[in-house]
Amino acid sequence: MRFTAPLILPAIFLAITAIVLEAQGPAGAASPDADSAAWSGTKWPEKDLGAPLLRDPIFVYNDWSAYDELSDNIPLTEQLAMKELDEILRLRKSGVRFDYYMMDAFWFDPDGGYRTWRKPNWPNGPNAWIKKCRDNGILPGLWFSTNTLVKINAAPEWQNSLTEKKGSMSFFEGGFLSNFMDSLQYWYDHGIRMFKFDFVDFNAATPETQRTKSQEEIQIRNADAFREALRKFRQRNPDIVLVAFNGFGGDVESTSGPFPFHNKVDLRWLEVFDSLYSGDPRASDVPEMNFWRSMDIYSDHMVRRYEQSFLPLERIDSTGFMLGNTGTIYYRKTNAWKGALILMMARGGWVNTVHGNLEYLTDEDARWFAKVQSLYLRLESMGRTKTFGGIPGDVEPYGFGSMDPEGTVYAVVNPAQVVQEIRMPLLSKEQGPLGAGRLLFEDAGFKPVLSGDRVKLGPGQMALVGFGKYARSTYDLGVQEDVRIPGSIRPVDASFVGHGKNTIEATVIMPKHGDLRLVMRQRSSDGNIMRSWKGGPPNGTNMGNFFQLRAWQDGKPVPVEIHYDKVIWSGLSWAVGEIKHDAVTAGQPVTVQCSSGENDAVDLEGKTYEVEY
């Protein structure tokens, strides 16, 4: 029911108006106290704006992927951590902003109950690192595996909270939670201001409780106990940042799983966490010739799914930007890093996490990095970000639009094996016409075609488009030369048939001018997209050997160029390769074959395309 207060309660309204005007002072007069709330005259410190959660976007450096002790054997050491801190300070000179340094997994002594640091990796403990961070205006953070025993042993105080298998602890039984929160407070008192919680287990219960309580009741009691403990921790330490990772809801293994999530996201976690993450970087189930673009699509897809689960974009940490030469990031180094950075910012999260080896970025790279930050930090802080288009994992064109009163920036992606046009809609009814736009960034190869509020993209291409103030050349970000998109693509008829176990084969006519692109997708016998997990480094299987694409002409093998030939800890459901036109005779038959190394029977789907670069 809508009503107008002056008409319903004129006397009360006039009285309230008089009180408000008295509190504000004479018309046009400045407030006598800049920290006072104008409507009440009550003193309200500026630092409390938005409390107890983040008031503005932040940038976090995380050293995971510079080292990797899970899918690789590169350890975290004090030397590595201090080196990356020096790199932060170097990048700052070029304008890059970092607010926090998150020390990720396994800094702790396995027998120290999160109170002591691992030796010999940290012979003198963390004091030098903490001091150097704080001396340079960077707030340090620490990673915890919450209530699971990941490379840590149960402290004496945790023993009466252990599960029967002794792999995790109950939050609502025994001494674990109290001791754990004391450890967090200990580190706060020693200068830590950001806390990352990973690998949580809400199914944990002591053997007696496991026998007498339902699993649902155990989950509820664990979540309630931990959430209340974090709430009290926040009240005591209002300047902390808390971030949630694995176990706090959502299904992050693939982009082809059912939705809504089987593991629902409890929105009450937003009462205590500044952000929830949406999955570590991995390939999506969308095949792409450029492996890194498929990873972009994964992060884009998961952010959309978490948004559809009613999380505000500001509270989702896509964790989509990692540099490094470790197994966790598939030895990416800096491949296609510019597009990954733009998309991380474009997704609208307020916790923007940069992982890995900062030394891989040159000073010139740093200046470009700072330019992207400057663009998006203003849009995130002063404006809004909204999603539009289709669902990334459904292979539909999509994007993220960010606006402020002066203009709009659209990050757009075409995940399909076809040239497609996408409309960039107005993001608000209050928004005026877009006017003339400008391409600010694009992948190499196919030249995006901008026409009014529409842009045409090549297969697997991303671009950035600015309108209003952001259509000026000063916002140009250039071309991503290490992602090359075909100038044209068209399907080539191919009838694939079975050719032995988990193998399909077809004979096609090699295009007269372009290359032949071969795309394979793997499904289980029930028709669902199926990932194969063959382990991480150093002992995992290279997926280029597991998913094999072969070709012959006149009985002789011809090379097939692939980019998925990596040891992929997170699994893969597809393969894409190209036969270059100068490696075969154009216009003549070529036999192509796709195979999977799965032991059980799978269904393989093959398609071929002519692509010209």
Language model: regions and residue ranges:
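C-terminal beta-sandwich/jelly-roll accessory domains of carbohydrate-active enzymes
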Residues: 385-396, 405-407, 412-613
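Basic/polar N-terminal segments that are highly enriched at the extreme N-terminus
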Residues: 1, 19-29
